[in-house]
Amino acid sequence: MSKQTLILLYGGRSAEREVSVLSAESVMRAVDYTKFFVKTYFISQTGQFIKTQEFSSRPTLTERLMTNDTIRLEQQIRPSDIYEEGAVVFPVLHGPMGEDGSIQGFLEVLKMPYVGTNILSSSVAMDKITTKRVLESAGIPQVAYTVYIEGQDLDRCLAETEAVLSYPVFVKPANMGSSVGISKAESEEELRAAILLALTYDSRILIEQGVLAREIEVGLLGNTDVKSTLPGEVVKNVDFYDYQAKYIDNEITMAIPAAIDESAMTSMRTYAETAFKAIGACGLSRCDFFLGQDGQIYLNELNTMPGFTQWSMYPLLWEHMGLSYAELIEELVRLAQEMFEKREGHLI
């Protein structure tokens, strides 16, 4: 039986490109090489597509994917050169130009099956402000928030925020993930600085009420028949779960399943599945919840391309459900092929 070609796209133009490389390296090591032949393409920070490595068997522990430090100019290709009939693309890309609908649209133009959510759903989920408005319409509870758009009167925004929220608040670029550009503010001075920092990443800024809460996450897998995992908990050794804590300092651990009551578990899984359907997602997603000290549940974020390293919450949640990392990748490829056939059928 011939092997299925799996194309990994990694790197990318966003500030989350380092996470992308870590995720792609984990995938290339976990793949069942009796079933898959893996080709890899690096997208540089300036948007060039670079043909990197191919793997017909599991790479050695010391082998790394090529990145900015090791690529050669002659390896650059036209983006459309990644096309290969019958191949499935796994865009292991995070943040803008990765999970915002851009690469998804490109792959649909090429008529290639790809892992993950479609153009519209990716675009909606990438923008935290738009996501909140969609989830509000679906009746899913969220923390109170205000919005600042670049060019608006900043002093007025500060006054309006202080009128409806209380410190501390969290300031987030609308279009970034992995906690990039997010700050905690406990005064007007800190809020102003946090907004200015967030503006270096995006022109749309979300300001959320801080809550004393546990951080609980639920994994989602499927197309129209979405399934959810038991919730897992992010156990922090730091005050704020930022990019540094997540990926560099390793100052977090995970409890799977989370030590919460059955009622909260059921509610979170229901909210997660409802959110997945509300944005029209497919393939995979991860819903991040806050569980307040009063038992109140808030859906904080819906991530359509969650971190996919071997130590990331998403694959660990499914491993607890009995689906190994390699089996998870295989199922995502199957779901990608299923959605591709459905999309193509709709065009006939």
UniProtKB/Swiss-Prot annotation:
Q: What is its EC number?
A: 6.3.2.4
Q: Where does Mg(2+) 2 bind?
A: E301, N303
What keywords tag this UniProt record? ATP-binding, Cell shape, Cell wall biogenesis/degradation, Cytoplasm, Ligase, Magnesium, Manganese, Metal-binding, Nucleotide-binding, Peptidoglycan synthesis
Catalytic activity from the UniProt record? 2 D-alanine + ATP = D-alanyl-D-alanine + ADP + phosphate + H(+)
Q: In which pathway does it act?
A: Cell wall biogenesis; peptidoglycan biosynthesis
InterPro entries linked to this entry:
ATP-grasp, ATP_grasp_subdomain_1, D-Ala_lig_Van_CS, D_ala_D_ala, Dala_Dala_lig_C, Dala_Dala_lig_N, PreATP-grasp_dom_sf
The residues covered by the ATP-grasp domain are 132-334
Cofactor(s) needed: Mg(2+); Mn(2+)
Its Gene Ontology cellular component terms are: cytosol
GO BP, one example?
peptidoglycan biosynthetic process
The record's section on Pfam families has: Dala_Dala_lig_C, Dala_Dala_lig_N
The task this protein performs is described as: Cell wall formation.
The family this protein is said to belong to: Belongs to the D-alanine--D-alanine ligase family.
What is the name of the protein in this document? D-alanine--D-alanine ligase
Its lineage opens with: Bacteria, Bacillati, Bacillota, Bacilli, Lactobacillales
